[in-house]
């Protein structure tokens, strides 16, 4: 049994239990995409809507649902707290796969879209959807998703490319007509070209013929047909094409017209000689030979199977007996998430330079695309990096157990020979520092988006500190470790330096100082003391950088003299009554003064010198979401620089003496062993 538990980040753990009607273990399904727009109303855990939602999801994942048809709708409650939902399984999957996929998606819905009233989750085998509005028999184009094969059509001849595009378009549109006319609203097609082409289209069966056809045609137009494969999802329909068989051809054979065999010429018929006839005497002799040869081979194979089955069972039992602790971080227990190196190598085109996404703290990160079309981020650890076996194991163990929309999701790992690789979900919009520290990119993140990012980071850290099964201290929160999803949703990444706390543990000491210059709290950088308040300090620095578009590590001028780093500069502006001078000029006047001022105030509370003065992440989330909460007066920040270089506060004086080897001169993460 794998020790990678899936546990909900919501406090109401009974929710997961109430949605587990199946006795058999549910297999994992790859999450392709989700839609939970922030503009839609949310609900609270004590609301009637949440009670109705639990009833609805239990109904959709019950044994009585219509898995045989692959489609089920349900409604729970009365207006204004009514919840309407449905699931749609791919038309070729079995009832068992459909049932397991729906059960899996029901369990995951609150991981991806906590407290959202309108949700769509996309998996390869099924789609789950619910809303506070009536979504039945209605076409919806909101919440779309597109996945494209990374390879372009391999032809330098533009005419051939256009011919392929026309073939895909025309065949998909013909399939759309067939699907719209069918009762199941599902159709597949296989076309024999120089290379086979496989296509699949599907609508929710509750749509009319016209609505289904219109939806499929719109989805086909939404795809880039210059790739060798792609798919487009709407909540009401989806279409896909590939150059390999991605569906069960046996299950869909009735919907695909069989290809007639080519007519053979008389000369070709002569070459198709019938098999030799065997006399009764020869038949008996041949049968004896077959028995003598085949039976020992089968017996030998059965012995091998029995041996390895017993060995695997023994290994699995050992894993079950060893509970997960910070010390018991044997990476071999993650077998269920292990990827084959050749598969990763193929997905990244042998780690091609064109697929390189960037340079991480311990190695390079590449984009990979598996044959199923799933895009991933592959972190290939450098053989000369500072991350050893412990850091690698730590990142796998920590991240694989974390499920939250504001955390990057670990899909698996590879540990072969001297290769150590982590496979994450692909986050398309790079990292936060790529936008806020670049003068040409800053304008793409207006204040509304940045305010949402601040809230997302806060919720992600709160989950690490309080709402996950274990208390996780990240220890390297910085702009480069905040990735941005499709909707600029913030996702915390890079857990190679994270630490797990025990149930009653609140702080710890270490001789191994890790982190990034400018983000480390004073007590951690000086004495190796770290706690949840260490991450709070880093969060405060992050907020100031997001608001200003400036790096904390730079030195800033004020009234013609040095004002120190960004934290000190902000404190001086705050003390002078002019905090809004910190605001990124790219906002112009398009921001809410009260929101920006409140965020600056909260950030200064986070970077106070004394750890006990800093708020907890739960208090910070409340401060960000409830404007009526009064804020305390911030005290002087840690690492405060006075106007004269001879008047630096004591901590800074000592830092210059004791931590020359601790702080990196750039933004790279550092790992150094220093005495306390």
From Swiss-Prot:
Q: What is this protein called?
A: Cysteine-rich receptor-like protein kinase 4
- Residues the record lists as binding ATP: 357-365, 379
> According to its UniProt record, which reaction does this protein catalyse?
L-seryl-[protein] + ATP = O-phospho-L-seryl-[protein] + ADP + H(+); L-threonyl-[protein] + ATP = O-phospho-L-threonyl-[protein] + ADP + H(+)
Residues in the Cytoplasmic compartment per record: 309-676
Record-annotated membrane-spanning stretches? 288-308
Pfam families with a match to the protein in the record: PK_Tyr_Ser-Thr (PF07714), Stress-antifung (PF01657)
Where is the stretch described as Disordered?
252-279
Where in the sequence is the active site? 476
Gene Ontology CC annotation, any one: membrane
**Any idea which residues bear Phosphothreonine here?**
516
Tell me which UniProt keywords the record has, alphabetically. ATP-binding, Glycoprotein, Kinase, Membrane, Nucleotide-binding, Phosphoprotein, Receptor, Repeat, Serine/threonine-protein kinase, Signal, Transferase, Transmembrane, Transmembrane helix
Compartment list: Membrane
């Amino acid at each position: 049994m794998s020790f990678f538990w899936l546990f909900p980040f919501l406090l109401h753990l009974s929710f997961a239990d109430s949605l587990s009607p199946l006795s058999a273990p549910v297999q994992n399904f790859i999450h392709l995409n989700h839609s939970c727009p922030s503009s839609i109303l949310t609900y609270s855990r004590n609301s009637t809507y949440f009670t109705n939602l639990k009833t609805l999801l239990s109904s959709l994942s019950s044994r009585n649902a219509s898995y045989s048809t692959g489609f089920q709708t349900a409604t729970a409650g009365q207006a204004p707290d009514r919840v309407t939902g449905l699931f749609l399984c791919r038309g070729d999957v079995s009832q068992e796969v459909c049932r397991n996929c729906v059960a899996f998606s029901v369990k995951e819905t609150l991981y991806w879209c906590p407290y959202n009233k309108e949700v769509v989750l996309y998996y390869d085998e099924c789609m789950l959807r619910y809303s506070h509005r009536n979504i039945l028999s209605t076409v919806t184009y909101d919440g779309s998703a597109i996945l494209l094969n990374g390879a372009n059509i391999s032809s330098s001849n533009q005419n051939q490319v256009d011919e392929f595009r026309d073939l895909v378009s025309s065949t998909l549109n013909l399939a759309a007509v067939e699907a719209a006319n069918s009762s199941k609203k599902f159709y597949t097609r296989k076309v024999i070209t120089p290379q086979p082409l496989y296509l699949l289209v599907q609508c929710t069966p509750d749509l009319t013929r016209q609505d289904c056809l219109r939806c499929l045609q719109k989805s086909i137009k939404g795809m880039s047909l210059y790739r060798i494969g792609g798919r487009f999802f709407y909540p009401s329909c989806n279409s896909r094409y590939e150059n390999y068989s991605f569906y069960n051809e046996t299950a869909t054979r009735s919907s695909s017209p069989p290809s007639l065999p080519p007519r053979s010429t008389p000369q070709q018929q002569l070459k198709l000689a019938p098999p030799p006839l065997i006399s009764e005497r020869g038949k008996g002799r041949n049968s004896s030979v077959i028995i003598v040869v085949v039976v020992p081979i089968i017996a030998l194979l059965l012995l091998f199977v029995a041996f390895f089955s017993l060995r695997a069972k023994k290994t699995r039992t050992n894993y079950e007996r060893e509970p997960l602790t910070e010390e018991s971080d044997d990476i071999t227990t993650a077998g269920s998430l292990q990827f084959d190196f050749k598969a990763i190598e193929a997905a990244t085109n042998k780690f091609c330079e064109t697929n390189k996404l960037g340079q991480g703290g311990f190695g390079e990160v590449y984009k990979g695309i598996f044959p199923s079309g799933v895009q991933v981020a592959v972190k290939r650890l450098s053989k000369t990096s500072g991350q050893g076996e412990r850091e690698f194991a730590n990142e796998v163990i920590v991240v694989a157990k974390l499920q939250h929309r504001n955390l990057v999701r670990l899909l698996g790992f590879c540990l072969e020979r001297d290769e150590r690789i982590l496979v994450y979900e692909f986050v398309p919009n790079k990292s936060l520092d790529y936008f806020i520290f670049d003068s040409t990119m800053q304008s793409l993140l207006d204040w509304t988006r940045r305010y949402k990012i601040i809230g997302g980071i806060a919720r992600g850290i709160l989950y690490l500190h309080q709402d996950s099964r274990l208390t996780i201290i990240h220890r390297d929160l910085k702009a480069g470790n905040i990735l941005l999803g499709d909707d600029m949703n913030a996702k915390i990444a890079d857990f190679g330096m994270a630490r797990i706390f025990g149930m009653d543990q609140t702080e710890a000491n270490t001789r191994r100082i890790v982190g990034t210059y400018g983000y480390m709290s004073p007590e951690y950088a000086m004495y190796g003391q770290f706690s949840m308040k260490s991450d709070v300090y880093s969060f405060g620095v992050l907020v100031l950088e997001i608001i200003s578009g400036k790096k904390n590590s730079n030195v800033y001028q004020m009234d013609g003299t040095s004002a120190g780093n960004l934290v000190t500069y902000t404190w001086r502006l705050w003390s002078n009554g002019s905090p809004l001078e910190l605001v990124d000029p790219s906002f112009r006047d398009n921001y809410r003064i009260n929101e920006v001022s409140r965020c600056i105030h909260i950030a200064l509370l986070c970077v106070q010198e004394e750890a006990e003065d800093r708020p907890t992440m739960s208090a910070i989330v409340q401060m960000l979401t409830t404007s009526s909460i009064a804020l305390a007066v911030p005290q002087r920040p840690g690492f405060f620089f006075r106007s004269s270089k001879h008047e630096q506060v004591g901590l800074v004086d000592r830092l210059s003496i004791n931590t020359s080897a601790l702080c990196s001169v750039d933004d790279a993460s550092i790992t150094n062993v220093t005495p306390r």
